[in-house]
Amino acid sequence: MELFLDVLGESLVDTAKMLPFLFLAYLLIEYIETRHGERIEALLAGGGRWGAIPGAVLGCVPQCGFSAIASNFYSSRVITLGTLMAVYLATSDEAIPLLVSMPAYWDKLAVLMVIKVVYAIAVGFALDFVLRGVLPKSLRGGYTGHADEVDCHEEHSDEAGNAQPIWKAALRHTLEIFVFIFAFSLVFGLIVEGVGEDVFADLLGSMGFFQPVVAALVGLIPNCAASVLLTQLYVEGALRFSSLVAGLCTGAGVGLAVLWRTNPSWKQNLFITGLTWGAGAVLGVAMQVVVAVFA
């Protein structure tokens, strides 16, 4: 019981730290949705399939809010699948500030960010251009109608039909996601505390050549603790750099959790989750092959 209460408290505090940024993110979404419909239309009319570039750049910012925004926009079909994946793969959550605090790893951080951004853009373009004809139309994303039809959420009005302030809608969505993320954080915290970080390190070390595959799986956990764990294991020498890259590529912060909450198609969500994991694992294994051949 003591262990449960400790993890419960830590999960609550860690998740609560996300609330201000999540609220601002949702407030931005509501503001854009209600006040800038024409600008959205003009932006989308300019060619949304190139969105992988700004998506990857925004993903570099160590904040979970951008992946949450991307998930909401994809659920509303405002952005393409390629843009969504670019944001996910470029996101590094808490790994960046953690590595920034260690001057000895600044060179590795620079290499990490370059690899992630380039790879995120490449995957995004592959999905939006090369594989566009193969993917089902409902999965491609991207909005081609009129901006006044873009609705990331529902109409914000009371029973009398009066418009509600955007902050109320933003607050409600923030609290809904808070509960969802808190549940994930609690379960993950109990697993880590119950099994132990050493067990995770031993498991990753025993995987050998396929370590990136497992690291990519760990990265899928929608909690900043996952990116912190991967970074700490790398710093401690239990994780190879290729595995760190794989794990941080799949570490889209709360993006996947928000996607599962907002996108109604569980099949699409499952495919995107698997695609995120596969993209990270493939990159990690490919890096290991290159190192093995040329090192």
PLM-predicted stretches and their roles:
Residues 1-31, 38, 111-212, 273-295:
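Selected transmembrane alpha-helices and immediately adjacent juxtamembrane segments
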Residues 36, 260-279:
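Interfacial loop-to-transmembrane junctions
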Residues 45-46, 83-88, 270-275:
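Cytoplasmic-side transmembrane-helix entry/capping segments in multi-pass membrane proteins
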Residues 25-29, 41, 51, 67, ...:
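Short amphipathic alpha-helical segments
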Residues 39-66:
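Active-site-flanking structural segment that lines cofactor/substrate pockets
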Residues 58-114, 192-263:
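Membrane-interfacial helix-loop connectors
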